[in-house]
Amino acid sequence: MVKLIPRLSSRRNGRIRLRKNTRKISQGVIHIQASLQNTIVTVTDVRGRVVSWASAGSAGFKGTTRRTPFAAQTAATNAIRTAINHGMREADVLIKGPGLGRDAALRAIRRSGIRLELILDVTPMPHNGCRPPKKRRV
């Protein structure tokens, strides 16, 4: 449970405000979901509770620029910055999807200084399950 810490605010009428105590985590899991249109990076603790997340769309990219590797790199940097502020030092990386931003997001995480213990590709692959949709004709 998160404790609330009383904090005096001298700027606004001297009111006492309650502020959340940020969770300190040393280990975590970084999930990269790279779809064909967007890349979503979610940072969780070991139990799966979300610490931070970012996507190419939330990083300010709109339209077709969301699918670029640079947009994925920016999204990964934004998500990791918040995780480092929470005290994360080492993480596992789970990559899902066929998108263009897979490698760029992983490169950005490697450059961030977090020690990577495990890198897994968890893209769902059918064992000849459902029939795929018909091919697009453009």
From Swiss-Prot:
Family designation: Belongs to the universal ribosomal protein uS11 family.
GO cellular component, one term: plastid
GO biological process: translation
Protein localization: Plastid
Lineage of the organism: Eukaryota, Viridiplantae, Streptophyta, Embryophyta, Tracheophyta
GO MF, any single term: structural constituent of ribosome
Keywords: Plastid, Ribonucleoprotein, Ribosomal protein, RNA-binding, rRNA-binding
Subunit organization: Part of the 30S ribosomal subunit.
Protein name: Small ribosomal subunit protein uS11c
Keyword Cell membrane: no
One Pfam family from the record: Ribosomal_S11
Alphabetized InterPro entries for the sequence: Ribosomal_uS11 (IPR001971), Ribosomal_uS11_bac-type (IPR019981), Ribosomal_uS11_CS (IPR018102), Ribosomal_uS11_sf (IPR036967)
